[in-house]
Regions:
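Short, glycine- and small/hydrophobic-rich beta-strand elements in well-ordered beta-sheets
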Residues: 55-96, 131
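Short amphipathic alpha-helical segments
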Residues: 39-74, 114-123
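Active-site-flanking beta-strand signature of metal-NTP-handling nucleotidyl enzymes
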Residues: 26-34, 96-98
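Sec/Tat signal peptide C-region and signal peptidase I cleavage site
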Residues: 15-20
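Bacterial N-terminal signal peptides
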Residues: 6-14
């Protein structure tokens, strides 16, 4: 029950944040996770579910007004000392997820579609537990593509 309450509050807060104070112009967001080794498999399961959700609800070639321009998840080991990789890794994994939409309408469509995704509560819990940074709402600044 506690998880349901947390998920509903996070969703409502997120939707209000996205449309408050001019943030309805957002067309991107991203977040970073620092995940201890013992939770990596669970996080990757959630991210795999998220990718399937994205593939089933988003288009990179369709209507320009709601088109997803880019979606990526990158991962890499957390270094003991980022200035000296020779010191090794901590065993944790860093993940960075980013999404960029052609227009704010695409971002709004994503927020609406996410309410029907069964793993949304798990994703939100993961972000709260392991999140070390987020850009939400975000605004596409620059890109370089092939």
């Amino acid at each position: 029950m506690r998880m349901i309450i947390i998920a509903v509050c996070a969703l409502l807060f997120g939707m209000n944040t996205a449309i408050a104070d001019g943030h309805d112009k957002a067309n991107a967001f991203g977040f970073a996770l620092n995940v201890p080794a013992e939770h990596i498999a669970d996080v990757e399961e959630i991210l795999t579910s998220h990718m399937k959700f994205m593939q089933s609800t988003h288009s990179v070639t369709g209507d320009a007004s709601t088109r997803l321009n880019s979606y990526s998840v990158i991962k890499g080991p957390v270094l003991v000392d980022p200035t000296d990789p020779s010191k090794g890794t901590t065993g944790a994994m860093m993940y960075i997820l980013s999404e960029h939409y052609e227009t704010p309408a695409g971002f709004a469509k994503h927020m609406q579609a996410s309410t029907g995704w069964s793993d949304l509560p798990r994703m939100q819990e993961m972000m709260m537990k392991f999140g070390v940074g987020a850009v939400y709402p975000g605004f596409h600044m620059q890109s370089m593509n092939r």
